[in-house]
Amino acid sequence: FEYRGEAYFRKFKQAYGSKAHFMVAQIHIGEYIADMESKRDVLRKKVDTLQAKYDEHPTTKTGRQLGEESRNLAAAEKRLAEAAEYAKDGDVLPAAASLFVEHARETVYLFSGSVEKYKPFYASALIQHDAMLHLCVERGVTRYNFYGIDGVFDDPNSEGRGVLEFKQGFNGYVDELMGSFVLPV
């Protein structure tokens, strides 16, 4: 799908009013860094405790635990280094955005986009969860329409394959319909 430009989305909101829902997932980088520093500090204490225990009395179990917690600590330190890079982009980072349209019997996930370098935060999945909860479950709507997919789906290298797999990750299924069109008014 191609980006249709800001004017299109303004007209869309004007046409659909309160039935159109724009959702944005943001990373509050200061909070993220503080949380990761706290987790890193807890992991560092665990590693130090396990290392002392292993040095005093080496066992296979303690060695395994030490290895696992050391890997967790390294991962936390890596995330903190990445976060320091992200912080250069600002204090609040828009990671993904989506447009949903509510109808009486379904909610349609119409458009979305995400910032590639923030994909490890799974912002698109967070938006989906939030939309399913607030636009479907809370309203008693039983159909959540992931809308369009395109591509060659039996080719793992097709660009559309990732979109299909993302949507199937929510237990979705393919319902083949006639497609989309623009009706001039």
Residue ranges with predicted function:
Residues 2, 121, 125, 160:
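Flexible, glycine- and charge-enriched loops at secondary-structure boundaries
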Residues 141-185:
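Active-site/acyl-donor-binding loops of N-acyltransferases
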Residues 129-143:
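Conserved acyl-CoA
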Residues 98, 132-133, 164, 168:
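Generic hydrophobic alpha-helical scaffold/packing signal
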Residues 1-120:
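A conserved beta-strand-loop-helix scaffold within acyl/acetyltransferase catalytic domains
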Residues 119-133:
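Conserved acetyl-CoA-binding loop-helix of GNAT-fold acetyltransferases
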Residues 7-11, 127-131, 162:
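Alpha-helical elements of Rossmann-like donor-binding domains used by nucleotide-donor carbohydrate transfer enzymes
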Residues 114-122, 151-158:
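Short, contiguous acidic/charged loop-to-helix segments that flank catalytic cores in large enzymes
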